């Protein structure tokens, strides 16, 4: 069976592994998931990510990040634009997550970027997810 929303699947796997204090979480690889993982690492929400070749297909393995007293780096993840209801934002209406404390991941014509980068570059796009 095909997956309807692979990005939502990725976010759910991250959310569940984070709640259970797992060190790593594996998921099927795609370029967009790798770009999302890159953004999460750059913003300090995950420790790292790598691509593993399995016999059947590639896997994206994400290493989660926790503080010294096991506090989670990711407090929340939310999928915004879904296959049934797409959400777009113009450059003047880019969302702010928790008043600027969180990050919105936006798919633009210039690639995936955070809300701050999109505002700096003056581009809008599809709002994929919120991370805080």
Curated annotation (Swiss-Prot):
Keyword set, alphabetical order: Ribonucleoprotein, Ribosomal protein, RNA-binding, rRNA-binding
A GO MF label: structural constituent of ribosome
Pfam family for this entry, one: Ribosomal_S8
The keyword Transmembrane appears for this protein: no
Key word Oxidoreductase present: no
Superkingdom as given in the UniProt entry: Bacteria
PROSITE patterns according to UniProt: RIBOSOMAL_S8
Entry similarity comment: Belongs to the universal ribosomal protein uS8 family.
Record's function text: One of the primary rRNA binding proteins, it binds directly to 16S rRNA central domain where it helps coordinate assembly of the platform of the 30S subunit.
Name by which UniProt lists this protein: Small ribosomal subunit protein uS8
Species whose genome carries this gene: Thermobifida fusca (strain YX)
């Amino acid at each position: 069976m095909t997956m309807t929303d692979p990005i939502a699947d990725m976010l759910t796997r991250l959310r569940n592994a984070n709640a259970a204090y797992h060190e790593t979480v594996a998921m099927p690889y795609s370029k967009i998931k790798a770009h999302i993982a890159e953004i999460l690492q750059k913003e300090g929400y995950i420790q790292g990510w790598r691509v593993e070749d399995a016999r059947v297909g590639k896997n994206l393995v994400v290493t989660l990040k926790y503080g010294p007293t096991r506090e989670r780096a990711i407090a929340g993840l939310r999928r915004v634009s879904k296959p049934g209801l797409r959400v777009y934002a113009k450059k003047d209406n880019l969302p702010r997550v928790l008043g600027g404390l969180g990050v919105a991941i936006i798919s633009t014509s210039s690639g995936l970027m955070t809300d701050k980068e999109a505002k700096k570059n003056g581009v809008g796009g599809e709002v994929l997810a919120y991370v805080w």
